[in-house]
Regions:
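C-terminal hydrophobic helical "lid"/dimerization subdomain
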Residues: 244, 249, 291-350
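A generic structural signal for residues embedded in beta-strands
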Residues: 29, 107-108, 163
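Short N-terminal strand-loop motif that marks the start
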Residues: 1-73, 349-350
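Residue-level marker of beta-strand positions
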Residues: 26, 103-104, 114, 160, ...
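A structural motif shared across PLP-dependent enzymes of the aminotransferase-like
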Residues: 80, 109-121
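Glycine-rich cofactor phosphate-binding loops and adjacent beta1-alpha1 units
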Residues: 155, 201-280
């Protein structure tokens, strides 16, 4: 049996593992499809994550150094790559009552041939409806962060909306914004293929930020007013600077990205100072949710799964390219790390 592991920063490999029997509360899934996470996971893969030497302390609600002698947050050689898997249950523990052998399911899990997960009171272990798209299923995670960004931005009917960064989260945000009633939806991404897909699924316009004054172009497309809402998923300083320039007076930037450190030159003066800009940091996994107690991470997940399985969201175009598990180390290094412009969200078949 093999699993996909980061053996060193920016190096992926298939490594042998020994399978085990399930415990009473567990099921074993034979993976058929899967996908990695192109955002935070690749930051970890590049050894650029704050979680390596620090941890987010829930009591203090801040990053603090890991205690001396404790394991690092990411240990290369043990760090498994992958985010979602779809497959069939091949073994059930004695206490499992909601699932049976042969069920097709989707869950969080690394890219490996078999995955063992808790199957007692685990709503994250999702049964796949008959005929459901595996490509939609592996977008379960990015859909949550897209929905959170849209909700936290408070998009309303008639709004002018911009989505910066057209990876999986941005593409799903485009669909949600348009379906929420936005009158003008603008995508921003330098990759034309991504822009084509965004136009196919709701974007009225797309802008290439390279060599373009994105803020000015947003103002031109909205009759000089600017965007009511900008959803920023890229994490780059230039993108946020352009968003502040293209935002309408009193508008909201929903900041979804797990940002990289900003270089010298980022400016919170200029348009941000004059136009009463609001920046809301949006993260589906942070509890309590801004709309607690009505909304929680669980409700976001339940809603996203329903929208993915009933076809309200269409992610078939987003899973690109699709590679085999056998070639996944080289494919991961190429499409996820070295040349992310060649992919949106890489799919894996077993």
């Amino acid at each position: 049996m093999k699993k996909l592991v980061a053996t060193a920063p920016r190096v992926a490999a298939l490594v042998e593992y020994e399978d085990r029997a399930v415990e009473a509360h567990e099921v074993k899934i034979r993976a058929r499809f899967g996908a990695p996470k192109h955002g935070t996971e690749v930051v970890d893969f590049r050894a650029a994550s704050p979680f390596i030497d620090e941890e987010f302390n829930a009591e203090w609600q801040m990053f603090t150094p890991r205690e001396e002698g404790t394991a690092r947050g990411i240990e290369f050689g043990k760090f498994q790559l992958g985010n979602m898997i779809v497959g069939d249950i091949i073994e059930c523990g004695d206490d499992v009552t909601e699932y049976q052998i042969g069920d097709s399911v989707c869950c969080y899990g690394p890219l490996q041939e078999t995955v063992i997960v808790n199957a007692v009171n685990n709503y994250k272990l999702r049964k796949m409806p008959q005929g459901a798209s595996w490509k939609n299923a592996v977008c379960y995670d990015p859909a949550q962060f897209a929905m959170s960004g849209v909700r936290d931005a408070n998009i309303r009917v008639g709004d002018f909306v911009v989505v910066v960064g057209l990876g999986a989260i941005g593409q799903i945000a485009i669909q949600l914004a348009k379906k929420a009633g936005a009158s003008v939806v603008i995508g921003v991404d330098p990759i034309e293929h991504r822009c084509e897909i965004a136009r196919r699924h709701g974007a009225d316009h797309c802008l290439n930020p390279i060599g373009t004054d994105v803020g000015l172009e947003i103002k031109k497309l909205t009759g000089k007013q600017g965007a009511d809402v900008i959803i920023e998923t890229s994490g780059f300083a230039d993108a946020l600077q352009s968003a502040l320039r293209g935002l309408a007076y009193g508008g909201t930037i929903s900041y979804v990205a797990f940002a990289k450190p900003f270089a010298e030159g980022f400016n919170l003066g200029r348009e941000a100072h004059f136009n009463n800009a609001k920046i809301v940091f949006s993260r589906a996994g942070s509890e309590p949710n801004p709309d607690y107690p009505r909304w929680s991470r669980k409700r976001i997940e339940e809603t996203c799964w329903e929208l993915l399985m009933n076809g309200y969201l269409n992610c078939d175009d987003l899973i690109d390219p699709v590679v085999t598990f056998t070639t996944s180390p080289e494919s991961y290094m190429t499409y996820v790390d070295q040349h992310p412009e060649l992919s949106i969200k890489m799919g894996v078949t077993f």
